[in-house]
Amino acid sequence: MITSQKTLSIEASPQEVWEFLTDFPSYPSWVTDVVEAVVEAPRLERGTRINILRLYGNRRVNGVEEITEWEPLKRLRMQTPSGSFIADAIYTLKSEQGGTQVNYEVQIVGHGFSKILEWFIRGNFQKLVDSEFARMKTMLETRHVTV
């Protein structure tokens, strides 16, 4: 099993952070391996599925993530219902003075041959999460900068 946890403060309102996290088509701009994310429904809510195309090396992998918890401005939980890797990711938002605290927790379990790949992925996974969250923080905080 691969696990990661990240907590950071972002100088943006919970509304802005929530809108950013739930703008799935924009995921390729900050989530490293995502090439495309397409929402299957006209409205985001519990049960909504998102088709995600990821690029691992030269290999394109299609997958589905499902929203399993939906508490606007507070909590978003997404799970992959099937595949070589089963992921369970939780974003929790908390208003704080000057912005929003974001807590992220993820567990990924490989099945079959992918179980062997966990060992290779685990080493760099936290660095990847740290990089993506730094990118998210920069993108949200620079929205307020005027030139």
Where are these regions (language model features)?
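Short, surface-exposed coil-to-beta transition loops
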Residues: T3-Q5, R60-V64, F85-I90
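Generic structural detector for well-ordered beta-strands
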Residues: T7-E11, V38, L53, E66, ...
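Helix-adjacent hinge/juxtasegments
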Residues: R59-T68, Q79
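Short, cysteine-centered beta-strand-loop-beta hairpins and adjacent loop/turn segments enriched
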Residues: L55-V61, G110-F113
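Short beta-strand segments that buttress and anchor functional surface loops
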Residues: R49-L55, R75-S82
